[in-house]
Amino acid sequence: MNDIAIIYSSFAGKTRAVSKYIAEKIGADTFDLKQQTNIDLSFYKTIILGTGVHAGKPYRRLTDFVEKNRVALRDKQVYLFVCCIYNGQKAENQVGNIASGYGITNAVYFSSNSEKNEAKLSKDVDVFIERVRP
C-alpha cells in the first residue's frame, strides 16, 4: 500500500485517465467513487481528489465523499484537481470556488483545451505531478 491515495469522480473518462496517469507516475492507490465510497483514509498521508465539472459544479460523488470525510481529511496533505473545458480566469474562478467549498487550498485545473503531453493529457498534469511527487 502507498501513502498517497487518488480519489476521483469521473463521468466521461477524462478525470479517470488523469487519475490513473498521476498514480502511475507517483505510485499512488486510486479509488473510483463510482465503484467504492467507503475508503479508509488512515493509511494515507496525502490525498489527491479529482473531479470533472458539470454546470460549474463538481461531480456529486466527490462532494458527498468530502462532506462525509471532512474530519479525516483535516489531518492529511490534500490536493484537488479539476478537469474542465475552460482556461484562464474562468477556470481559475471555477477551481477556486470548488476548492473553497471543500476547504482545500492546494487546487489546480486541467483544461481539455490546453497543450497536451505524450499521454494526450494537459501538460499541466506533469507540472502537478512534480509538485506532489514524494
Describe these PLM feature segments.
Residues 33-36:
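Conserved SAM/SAH-binding loop
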